[in-house]
Amino acid sequence: MNANQAAESNLLASNQQKELEDLPKDYPLSTSEDEGDKDEERKHQKLLESISSLNGKDRQKLADRSEASLKVSEFSVSSEGSGEKLVLSDLLEPVKTSSSLAAVKKQLNRVKSKKTVELPLHREEIERIHREVAFNKSSQILSKWDPVVLKNRQAEQLVFPLSKPQSAFAPIEHVVNGWKAGTPLEQEIFNLLHKNKQPVTDPLLTPVEKASLKAMSLEEVKMRRAELQRARALQSYYEARARREKRIKSKKYHRILKKGKAKQALKDFEKLQKVNPAAALEELEKLDKARMMERMSLKHQNSGKWAKSKAIMAKYDLEARQAMQEQLARNKELTQKVRAASESEEEGEGQEEEEEPLVPDLVNEVQIKANGLNPWMFRNHFIDAKEAEVQKDLEDPAEPEAQETSESEEEKAVVEEETLLKEFEERRSLRQKSELNHMAEPVHRRVTKDPSSQEVLSDLRALCQKLRTENHQSGKQELSSARTAQREEPAREEEEPMLLQRPERARTLDELEELGREGCVENEELPRTAVEGLQLEKNLSNHIGAPKEKKRKEQMIDLQNLLTTKSPSVKSLAVPTTVQELEDEEERDQRQIIKEAFAGDDVIRDFLKEKREAVEASKPKDLDLTLPGWGEWGGIGLKPSAKKRRRFLIKAPEGPPRKDKNLPNVIINEKRNTHAAAHQVQVLPHPFTHHQQFERTIQTPVGSTWNTQRAFQKLTMPKVVTKPGHIIKPIKAEDVGYRSSSRSDLSVVQRNPKRLSIRHKKHLENNCVD
């Protein structure tokens, strides 16, 4: 309709235009007519505008006229008035009744049942579907390995290859069944074993025992089983007891156990000696021979390959350390001299082990000389060797001196002297053991050689005897006799070295008080003779005026005073003081030792110089803009004037105060180290949840200096360990308990990826959604 209206309007406009063009040709125009023409044009223009503004709906509809015709065309069919479309079934209505068109009907029904074929998907869409399906399927397959990957990531250490081949051990019966005797000796042994029915393996019961059990009655079998159970229980009890005893680390327990075993062996030997003297003599010869062989073989001297290897591993292995300790104990046992110990000595040793000292060991230490030599530069092993020689000499049995007279008093004095000497030797050995742990010893102590120590001991006994005989005389006579006895030996004392002077160990509070009363410190500035005379007078006056409370203690004090030979370089015994004074003295000695050790190093001056340089380097520098030759002469040897320098000098502002400004003993470097920035952590690492955890881990020391060997190995063990020569294969599904499927949903895509039907696409999409 709109098209018809537009055509009509165009036709009308063209007709009017033609009429206007033809007007001037028919009629000539005048001036008045020109004015009229203008008015007409104006009116015509308005007419055109009004025509163009008209709506097509308001126009009248032209009527169509149809005429009958003899020739009917297919285009003349009109469906006007019906309101329905023409359907193929309407045309086939008259055909339904005819039976000749049955085949056409079937074909028509088949065509009706078929649906329209969808267009094939585009290549990009097919590839996108392939990618989505492959991603979903591969992520589903890989998600099965998440627990395995997480376990490997959380493991402290991974040792590759992960699958360790299990070594197959063939049973002994399989080995024996295929074995044949090759030599006559093997054949003879094999025949004996099979003849007596001895088990080749290690069964619970032998064939003989099985046969005997079959022959037993029920009661005998029960009794036999009860005996076996009791034997097993006893065996397990003794094994547990042996394990408990082996874990005991008490030295006192092992010492008592060792003494008990030695006493039991001695009792068994005495019993054997009474029953069978010949066997006892043979046993004694065996022991002596074994001791001689041990001493000759030197296997106990820590010089063999085994000892050296154990010494290296003793730091890490407890068993190696125990083996080294046993060897050292064996060495000490073999190298010491054989001396029969009396019962009284054994009882005394037992009492000394059981008793605990009431006075601490710090009270008995001798104060070290403040201005002495540096003990770090002194060789202690030389002194230890000399002390060992003196100890061996002192352990030799003393010669009896009581044979000269037959009086009872002299015999008692000799017995007391012998007991005092033995006690002195025992205390001396104890002091030597305790002083092995000291870091330094005074340099001015020296040890006598063998002949000199014997002579001093003989002089000691003579002087003790003189003192006992002259106790009833007057003090003046005792003083004169002691002075004469002292003057007789000056040359010998100057030529020979002195005995090692050691303080007496006070074990009770009474002994501590007595030592406090009797001990005194000698003035070193006095001459030798004056000091000796004063000391002798004081000792003799103490002996005369002191009450006789305990004779044994008095004799021991006399022995100690007489044994102490004075010299300007040797200090006397120090009076026991409190623990605080000893600590102060140790601090002073330590300061003196450090001062002597670092005598050539002026550490404080170097430190102050280094700090001064660091402070100067950290200060902001002034900017000098002076240029030579500007405003004045310049050249070699000419410097800018001070006025010009002050004019062009830009002073730098003062920087912030240093952190170590009020810390004289510290240098704090405030510069940013660019090399350290690469090792700084910007983000918190994965396993940690808080920065304090990470800082605590970083601050924990890792080195072997601050940790035990086991902890150091655990902290520094590598994350991954690979064995050389082994092939590392990838993990298989069978290794972790999964079954590998031979067919998957991706098989269709992998087989023909470019031909993906709609059915397969829907199936794959449903699987992806699931």
Curated annotation (Swiss-Prot):
Modification after translation, per record: Citrullinated by PADI4.
Region (Disordered): 1-65, 334-361, 392-455, 467-505
GO cellular component, one term: small-subunit processome
Any one biological process term the GO annotation gives: rRNA processing
Main location: nucleus
Keyword Nucleus: yes
UniProt KW keywords: Citrullination, Coiled coil, Isopeptide bond, Nucleus, Phosphoprotein, Ribosome biogenesis, Ubl conjugation
Keyword Phosphoprotein found: yes
Polar residues: bias regions: 1-17
Biased composition (Acidic residues): 343-358, 396-410
Residue stretches of biased makeup (Basic and acidic residues): 56-65, 411-444
Location of Phosphoserine modifications: S30, S32, S53, S78, S82, S406, S408, S453, S567
Chain segments annotated as coiled-coil in the UniProt record: 41-68, 217-291, 318-348
Function: May be required for ribosome biogenesis.
UniProt-recorded name of the protein: U3 small nucleolar RNA-associated protein 14 homolog A
Organism, scientific name: Bos taurus
Taxonomic lineage: Eukaryota, Metazoa, Chordata, Craniata, Vertebrata
Gene symbol of the encoding locus: UTP14A
